[in-house]
Amino acid sequence: MNSSILTGIFGGSFDPPHEGHSEILKSFFWEVSDCKEVFVIPNRQNPLKEEKISLPENILEMLNLFVSEFSQSIRILDLELKRSGPSYTIQTIQELKTIYPNRKFVLLIGEDNYSNFHKWKDWEKILTEVETIFVFRRFSKEVPLNSHLNSLFEFKFLENPLIPVTSTDLRKSFFQSKVPNLISKKVLDYILKNKLYSK
C-alpha cells in the first residue's frame, strides 16, 4: 500500500447519524483533498457523555445507509463497538496503526471535544500518534482557543457550514413523537420502520 495514503478518523455516537455529520464529511473531503478515505468509527460509550440508546447493529445499519449517499471512500469500522466499556481514542488510533501500518492518520473532532480535549485519556500521546487534528464547528463561527493545547500542537479548523443539530436533540424529537428534519430519508425510514426511538 502506498505510504502517502492519508486517512481520516471520524468517531462519534452516530445515534442517529444526521445532516450535521454529512456536512462535516463533505467539508473535510473538500478542504483536505489529499485525504482519500475516512474511517467512520461509532463508539460504544463515550467516557464523557451519556449512554447510547441504540444497539450496535442498529447503529451500523444506519451508518451503512448514511454513507451510501457519498461518492467518496468512507469505511465504517466496528472495532469500538466490539469492546466492552468506554471507548478511548488513543486505543483506537494505536489499533488502527497496527492494522494499517502504511497509512497516515488525521483525526476529526468537534468544537466541544476540542474544548475538553485535555481531559481525554492520554491526550498528549494522541498528539504524537496523528498527523493533524481537524476541528469542525457545530454551533459557533469562532471557536475559543484551548490554552492547554495550542502551544503543543497545531489544530486546524474546518470551514464547515454550521448545522446546530445533535443526535441527542433528534432522539428527543422522536421520543416526543415528532419527526425531525436533518436526517436523510434512508436513515429516517429505517428509524421509523424499526421504532428505534419510540417510547
From Swiss-Prot:
Q: Per its record, how is this protein called by name? A: Probable nicotinate-nucleotide adenylyltransferase
- Cell membrane as a keyword of this entry, yes or no, is no
Q: Which organism is it from?
A: Leptospira interrogans serogroup Icterohaemorrhagiae serovar Lai (strain 56601)
Instruction: Report the Pfam families cross-referenced here.
Output: CTP_transf_like
MF term (GO), any: nicotinate-nucleotide adenylyltransferase activity
Describe the task this protein carries out: Catalyzes the reversible adenylation of nicotinate mononucleotide (NaMN) to nicotinic acid adenine dinucleotide (NaAD).
Q: Which reaction does it catalyse?
A: nicotinate beta-D-ribonucleotide + ATP + H(+) = deamido-NAD(+) + diphosphate
Tell me which Gene Ontology terms the entry assigns under biological process.
NAD biosynthetic process
Ordered alphabetically, the record's keywords are: ATP-binding, NAD, Nucleotide-binding, Nucleotidyltransferase, Pyridine nucleotide biosynthesis, Transferase
Return the InterPro entries for the record. Answer: Cyt_trans-like, NadD/NMNAT, Rossmann-like_a/b/a_fold
Q: Which family does it belong to?
A: Belongs to the NadD family.
Pathways involved? Cofactor biosynthesis; NAD(+) biosynthesis; deamido-NAD(+) from nicotinate D-ribonucleotide: step 1/1
Check the record and name the NCBIfam families matching this protein.
nicotinate (nicotinamide) nucleotide adenylyltransferase (TIGR00482)
Instruction: Name the gene behind this protein.
Output: nadD
**Highest taxon listed in the record's lineage:** Bacteria
Q: Is Ligase given among the entry's keywords?
A: no
Give the taxonomic lineage as stored in the record. Answer: Bacteria, Pseudomonadati, Spirochaetota, Spirochaetia, Leptospirales
Report the EC number(s), separated by commas if there are several: 2.7.7.18
